[in-house]
């Protein structure tokens, strides 16, 4: 059966093809009466006509398509959906976009490809970039002259909306909590640490808390690698095998922390009796963990919602939104004072 086209809609409504195009693209026209618009819309429904998105993009110079670009930090891995953080973020972003008449495209950037190239080739109306710290990438995105919102991204380029949590404070709160429980040999397990970014800022908070208690970070207890469940398991097995194990671990992401707990348990090390663990995110995993994970809560869904709102808002004045973090106590940290 032939797919209905503009001509079919025009004939059914008794109007010109141009009139149908005006109605579909919501083009202002004083000559179109409410009755005419209703006839066209009724004809569209009766025929089951589906507008051609590419044609609408050409007509309006607008795709109603927003991009969410997520770094593929681990080559060859399905990284972006292995971490519940991204599922929570995307669910909120997609819902907010859809309610406003937009669609969302999710993409990573392949090796040798820039975020700007991805945005340009997809004809995006705006871009949300998660976890980017490359100044040159920021400059290239700025040259596209489309709205950009940086989420958990720390680059020097100005002129963008940005959203983050107080990462340094979160790292400080987590480490201080362990210290206040009487733990003193505290490791930091995280993703790759550069000279900026969430992992670095959380490390700064970790360092600050240690210094307040007269301690210095031990190089051997700084374990950086992938942010994945599998890497967390490996780190748990590694810590279990140390002659002098830490008595507490601050982990920069819940997915890592849950893996860490599994790795420790498989080697006969108990959480929290032998090693206390605190995570960061407060994802669903933290509640499903055994024992339930004490963690730093950040509202990931709010990040996704706010990112889309900033993107579709016509106000281009850059806004910097910093969300607070809170401590969620569960069962993965013991009070060492009780064992003195």
Language model regions located:
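Alpha-helical recognition/docking segments in bacterial nutrient-uptake
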Residues: 1, 61, 65-176, 235-245, ...
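Alpha-helical structural signal in soluble globular domains
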Residues: 43, 92, 96, 201-213, ...
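Flexible loop/turn connectors
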Residues: 237-340
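Hinge/beta->alpha junction and helix N-cap segments in small-molecule ligand-binding domains
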Residues: 76-87, 103-114, 163-173, 189-211, ...
């Amino acid at each position: 059966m032939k797919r209905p086209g503009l001509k079919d809609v025009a004939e059914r409504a008794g109007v010109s093809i141009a009139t149908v195009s005006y109605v579909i693209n919501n083009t202002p026209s004083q000559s179109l009466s409410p009755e005419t618009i209703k006839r066209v819309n009724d004809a569209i429904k009766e025929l089951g006509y589906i507008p051609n998105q590419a044609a609408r993009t050409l007509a309006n110079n607008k795709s109603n398509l927003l991009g969410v670009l997520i770094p593929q930090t681990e080559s060859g891995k399905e990284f972006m959906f292995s971490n519940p953080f991204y599922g929570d973020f995307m669910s909120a972003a997609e819902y907010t976009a859809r309610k406003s008449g937009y669609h969302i495209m999710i993409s990573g950037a392949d090796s040798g490809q820039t975020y700007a190239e991805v945005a340009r080739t997809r004809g995006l109306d705006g871009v949300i970039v998660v976890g980017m710290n490359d100044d040159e990438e920021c400059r290239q995105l700025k040259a596209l002259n489309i709205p950009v919102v940086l989420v958990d991204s720390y680059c020097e380029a100005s002129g963008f909306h940005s959203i983050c949590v107080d990462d340094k404070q979160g790292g400080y709160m987590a480490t201080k909590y362990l210290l206040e429980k009487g733990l003193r040999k505290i490791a930091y397990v995280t993703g790759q640490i550069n000279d900026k970014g969430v992992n670095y800022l959380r490390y700064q908070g970790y360092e600050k808390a240690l210094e307040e208690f007269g301690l210095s970070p031990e190089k051997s207890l700084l374990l950086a690698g992938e942010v994945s469940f599998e890497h967390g398991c490996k780190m748990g097995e590694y810590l279990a095998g140390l002659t002098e194990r830490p008595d507490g671990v601050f982990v920069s992401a819940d997915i890592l922390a849950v893996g860490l707990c599994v790795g420790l348990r498989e080697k006969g090390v108990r959480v929290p009796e032998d090693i206390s663990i605190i995570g960061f995110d407060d994802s669903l995993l933290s509640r499903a963990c055994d024992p339930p994970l004490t963690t730093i809560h950040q509202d990931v869904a709010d990040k996704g919602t706010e990112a889309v709102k900033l993107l579709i808002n016509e106000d281009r004045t850059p806004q910097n939104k910093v969300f607070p973090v809170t401590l969620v106590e569960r069962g993965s940290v013991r009070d060492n004072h009780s064992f003195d």
